[in-house]
Amino acid sequence: MRLLTMNALYTGDVPARLRALGAALDRSDLDIVCLQEVMYRRHARLLRRAAPAYRYVACSGTALLKGGLVLLSRWPISRYRFVRYPTTGPVRGELLMRKGAQLASVATPAGELVVVNTHLSANRDDDWSPTNRHTRIAAGELARLASLIAAVDPSLPVAVVGDLNLPRESAALTDFITAAGLSDVLAGDTRPTYRPTPGWPSPPALDHILIRSAAGETLTGSADLVFQEEVTLPDGRQTHLSDHYGVQAQLTRSK
């Protein structure tokens, strides 16, 4: 099964970029797509029109989508729910996004897969040391996420994906991966998943695909970065699809 996670960026030419993203997804061989920062239901509808190959969509909320989380799937989604993270730390605009985790059960040809799509709070200091104020916020969110993963039936495989806003080598993330019994599909990869800019020429990998095997099975994966190049919009302008790259994984279940 082929899975993608991507932060779609909530600002700047949003409808045009989402149409271009949807068209690219519709042409792809991806089976499950997990997006973050899709803030409005009208944008989820736009994606669905642009990518009709994905017959099944999971998102929560009316006008404003909870957590900005959307899952597109070629396979049936039997159930899904959104769980909001605890509100901690200073008052900040990001709280309006109601960040949390979306848990969905997808009926793949290989059997049921639990997909957890999430977007953690941003670290505005770019300091991921354990004592940083934003690291403490992330620790609370990760604790809630770990409890959600622990509650998933161990007979089911799990993929935890999204913009975790934590570098791969950060103690908060590595401790969470160990505590939750997960493995990082891109372990050891040093490439950034946030697009480098003159103001931030060497960003870290903030977007991750983490997996847990079902009891008695093995879930393995390989991954790569996608959607790194500019695209041409209908009016002729060139733009990137997002300020993040997509992370695509090929997951395989075996006994």
Which residues does each PLM region occupy?
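N-terminal, active-site-proximal structural segment of metallo-dependent hydrolase catalytic domains
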Residues: 1-50, 61, 142-143, 243, ...
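Acidic/histidine-rich helix-loop elements
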Residues: 3-19, 89-96, 121-137
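Catalytic metal-binding/acid-base residues of hydrolase active sites
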Residues: 9, 39, 76, 119-121, ...
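Active-site environment of divalent metal-dependent phosphoester hydrolases
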Residues: 11-13, 39-43, 64-66, 123-126, ...
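Structured beta-strand-rich core segments of catalytic domains in phosphoester-bond hydrolases
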Residues: 26, 32-122, 219-227
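His/acidic metal-ligating clusters that form di-metal
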Residues: 103-116, 134-161
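Active-site-proximal segments of metal-dependent phosphoesterases and phosphodiesterases across multiple
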Residues: 120-145, 168-177
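Metal-dependent phosphoester-hydrolase catalytic domains
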Residues: 150-159, 166-255
